[in-house]
Design a protein with these regions (language model features):
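Short, charge/polar-rich alpha-helical segments
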Residues: 1-13
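Short, charge-rich amphipathic interface segments used for partner binding and complex assembly
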Residues: 11, 15-62
Length: 62
């Protein structure tokens, strides 16, 4: 793996780590507004991770 691939992998892992924290927060939520905000955060982090994966696949010609 080259430096760029490692950086992308690190970015994906960071997004998934934040997603995991949001999942934990989601189960601790006690009102619907917090639940909604947490779900929005989870969605944003997954989309970011998927965009990084998609970009990497496009660069590799897949």
């Amino acid at each position: 793996m080259n430096k760029l691939e490692l950086d992308r992998l690190d970015a994906i892992l960071n997004e998934l780590s934040e997603f995991n924290e949001d999942v934990r927060s989601f189960y601790m939520c006690n009102d619907s507004l917090n639940m909604h905000n947490t779900i929005c955060d989870m969605r944003t982090e997954l989309i970011s991770a998927l965009e990084i994966v998609n970009d990497a696949e496009n660069r590799m010609g897949h």
